[in-house]
Amino acid sequence: IYFDEGTIAPIEQGPISIDVSMSFLNPLLAEEFQMQMVEVDAPVEGLDDGTKKRVALTFDDGPHPQVTKQVLDSLDRYNAKATFFMLGNRVQYYPEIALDVLNRGHEVGNHTWSHPVLPKLTEAQIMNEFSTTENAIISAIGQESTVFRPPYGSTTDAINAIIPRDVAIWSIDTLDWKHRDANKLVQSVKNQMHNNAIILMHDIHQSTADGLNGVLDYLANEGYEFVTVSDIMPYVQ
């Protein structure tokens, strides 16, 4: 409440203001001057407003009998979770590695059976690629995949509509399949990094396994939390 100078105190004290709770004052006012009180929920501690630093590491085209295990060991050292988009024809040969991926707390995604360019296939062929891979994944790990990635990132709205999974592409391509250089892997991530990034790598190249510790170290020092694709997708759609 604001009082002009001299109203309730000597004039030399100037204007006087008194803080009064609206919940106390409101009932004292005439009805036409009362204000509608709106209850506001208190902030929830730890509530994510979308600005938290997070990153999703993804690995395509495995599992591989040597490289995937090295990748898993590196992820363990940083308590980092990742998503592995697996080819059905490799899951069939290495089911125990696919199961190890799941048992270490990572996400398993479907990446088709034979890595075709999906827009060149018929709908029946596309669903066969998905379903045969899904059967191999279920046989290996005892549960379905949770996400899908089209080979080469090549897809259409029509294809996405028939795949019964969330379709995840990427926002950072490390080109690890091309340069096969551990140092370039780290630099590629540094050059392109942004919040809520989905990083594409491949757990079939030794150079990727060799460079992964550097990537993890950089991201950890920058304060990023390592999450799965399913965890990050609400923030990138």
Whereabouts are the PLM-identified features?
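Hydrophobic membrane-insertion alpha-helices, especially the h-region
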Residues: I1-D4
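N-terminal "first-domain core" detector
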Residues: A9-E12
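Catalytic domains of cell-wall/extracellular-matrix polysaccharide-remodeling enzymes
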Residues: Q70, Q92-Y93, P116-Q237
